[in-house]
Swiss-Prot record:
SMART domains: HhH1, TOPRIM. It comes from the Bacteria. Gene3D superfamilies: 3.30.60.80, 3.40.1360.10, 6.10.250.240, RecR Domain 1 (1.10.8.420). This is Recombination protein RecR. NCBIfam families: recR (TIGR00615). GO terms for biological process: DNA recombination; DNA repair. GO terms for molecular function: DNA binding; zinc ion binding. It comes from Staphylococcus carnosus (strain TM300). The keyword Lipoprotein does not apply.
Amino acid sequence: MHYPEPISKLIDSFMKLPGIGPKTAQRLAFHVLDMKEDDVVQFAKALVDVKRELTYCSVCGHITEEDPCYICNDKQRDRSVICVVEDDKDVIAMEKMREYKGLYHVLHGAISPMDGIGPEDINIPSLIERLKDEEVKELILAMNPNLEGESTAMYISRLVKPIGIKVTRLAQGLSVGGDLEYADEVTLSRAIEGRTEM
């Protein structure tokens, strides 16, 4: 079907988002067309602001408005423990349970040879550098319980063990193949409490 060019561009833009196919993109584009102009302007501004006003923490890699982020700046945090996660949504999920008091390191992905993603393509080199500078006693590997997450956890574990840092993995209770961000607070809390050494 041929759409006016502005609608086609909007549909193409929506399709760049994960999980948005042609039909959903079309539905969203026509919904935007029906919105009040003020709401569309506010929506567009929010999209631009998220790119312009946020950055990644130079210490942990978490999204932030100021560098270092509020977590790395918090002097009450236990600096001897770092929880390594795949993405920012995982930090948010962990923080919701209000039990973990250590620091984080965000990888921004997982090792996935099938997708051409190796250890150098995610935030692993900065983690190793960070471990040299800080007095970390434990590294909690909180990758998603899927093939990529397990591969990433094993890779990091092998790199870190010779340094003499205790490496633990979240307890299973998280479903295999599931994502950390969708786990409820109770499940996450139990997984943290029952973590195992690697």
